Amino acid sequence: MKLLKDSGAALLALFFVLVYLLPVNSRLLWQPDETRYAEISREMLQRGDWVVPYFMDIRYFEKPVAGYWFNNISQWIFGDSNFAVRFGSIFSTALSAVLVYWLATLLWRNRSTSVLATLIYLSFLLVFGIGTYAVLDPMISLWLTAAMVSFYLTLKAENWQQKVGAYALLGVACGMGFMTKGFLALAVPVIAVLPIVIQQKRIKDLVVFGPIAIVCAVLLSLPWALAIAQREPDFWNYFFWVEHIQRFAEASAQHKSPIWYYLPILCIGVLPWLGLLPGALFKGWRERATKPELFFLLSWVVMPLLFFSVAKGKLPTYILPCMAPLSLLMAAYATDCANNIRMRALKINGVINLLFGVACALVIVVIGLGLVKDIVAYGPQENQKVWLGVLAFAGWGVTGFITLRNNARNWRWAAACPLLFILLVGYLIPQQVVDSKQPQNFIKNNFSELSSSRYVLTDSVGVAAGLAWELKRSDILMFSEKGELTYGLAYPDSQDNYISNDDFPTWLAQARKEGDVSLVVQLAKNEALPAHLPPADKVNLMNRLALLWYQKTP
């Protein structure tokens, strides 16, 4: 504890650099998410249009613009590197960690606990996984964490001026959240604070001062909302009904999953601190009367989790906003256990990390060496990746064992359990996954043919985004499949961006008169090239991605 108190800031900075900064540029971008957000921001910068999102010259109305602005600024500062693509997420995660530290200080006035809460937050597997991944969830998580801190300030305000200021901050946080991911940023804070205002009898304050937050959120988002409504009148109709109602409530929602979906996600996501999860949640409920700040945190964990569980559409990234209050609850629980020498939960946490590391190392050995005939992850030339994977998880298990020694005296070292895995994960991915889910590798190996082609087509939106990003051209055409671009392709000025299977032979004959044509197709596992495609002058096949290159005809 003394080390955390004396050198906490330095340790956090070192951990952040090792985990969130050093490895990210060397990891290839994943499709469809990372390639999509990389390309949208590249096109925004190229167009100089920060109001209407376009994706490969096609209107893209799935999200508002504030998250793209983060990514735009990152690419403007750092260029077109993988680091630049991911820096918006990393920066948002860093700001969320600062807010965790600040709220912990407001709650307990104890520097060691504040450092511990921040360390727990940054070492959560879910926070690391999403916080170094180019999606918009770290941005919305930042604004919801800011909303949580702002609402706590409303509870501690001592006069009406402080309450007005705190509710104004709450409105700004919700407004920015709304401009990042829509109405979700308004629903989650309302759901989270209801049990708190009921328990603390603050309903009158919410009714009197709550409109200030609403006004601030509206004033902040209104200029962009009016601007996009003027330029694209159908944006709000599509964004509200399709992206919200259908995704969250209707039977046809995307990513449908059962109501218990988030339970295993939560358990995996809070590693390497899973052993503290039951006790932290129980402590927040058991001591709700004597320590209302714990119930405050519990409400911000449980209520959003229930909301996302009830929704029809589910993705692991949705529960990222629950991690900040959960890290604070865990820090309070762990500190209480250590101070009162109740080490059972801390020892259980060490055992979990030990067993998890050993189990994962064994699984990699068994699968990597081909001992399970039906599961082929690594090829014969990838033994180095297998042993790196074993090393990464062995390090996890060994660190878990270290936390158990001397009556779990070194329990805080659990934060270091995933360190080797985090540093090595980019080098552990099987080549068959790289070739199908990380198209940069494929594109670079075929760059000569692709860059010289007058037309480039593909049947995968994620691969199309990767092609556009690497080739620095937004005129990639969709072939056969429309995917998430279906709505945008319906506009009359975008219909030429799609070539159907039936139209392809005729279109190709005409296109080859203008220059070379490259068609990139994504195949199912062990699938052969479609027989109906016209014979190509050159075919390059890499696992599940294939390039069919058609040379210009006279």
Swiss-Prot record:
Q: Which residues form the signal peptide?
A: none
What biological-process GO terms show up in the record? lipid A biosynthetic process; lipopolysaccharide biosynthetic process; protein O-linked glycosylation; response to iron(III) ion
Q: Name one GO molecular function term.
A: mannosyltransferase activity
Locate the transmembrane regions by residue number: 87-107, 115-135, 178-198, 206-226, 262-282, 293-313, 315-335, 351-371, 384-404, 414-434
Q: How does it sit in the membrane?
A: Multi-pass membrane protein
**Record carries keyword Cell membrane:** yes
Answer yes or no on keyword Glycosyltransferase. yes
Q: What is its EC number?
A: 2.4.2.43
Tell me what reaction this enzyme catalyses. Answer: 4-amino-4-deoxy-alpha-L-arabinopyranosyl di-trans,octa-cis-undecaprenyl phosphate + lipid IVA = lipid IIA + di-trans,octa-cis-undecaprenyl phosphate
Pathway as given in its UniProt record: Lipopolysaccharide metabolism; 4-amino-4-deoxy-beta-L-arabinose-lipid A biosynthesis
Q: Which domain of life is it from?
A: Bacteria
Induction (UniProt): Activated by low magnesium concentrations, via the two-component regulatory system PhoP/PhoQ.
GO CC annotation = plasma membrane
Q: Where in the cell is it found?
A: Cell inner membrane
Task: Write out the entry's keywords from A to Z.
Answer: Cell inner membrane, Cell membrane, Glycosyltransferase, Lipid A biosynthesis, Lipid biosynthesis, Lipid metabolism, Lipopolysaccharide biosynthesis, Membrane, Transferase, Transmembrane, Transmembrane helix
User: What is the role of this chain?
Assistant: Catalyzes the transfer of the L-Ara4N moiety of the glycolipid undecaprenyl phosphate-alpha-L-Ara4N to lipid A. The modified arabinose is attached to lipid A and is required for resistance to polymyxin and cationic antimicrobial peptides.
HAMAP family in the record: ArnT_transfer
Could you say which protein family the record assigns here? Answer: Belongs to the glycosyltransferase 83 family.
UniProt protein name: Undecaprenyl phosphate-alpha-4-amino-4-deoxy-L-arabinose arabinosyl transferase
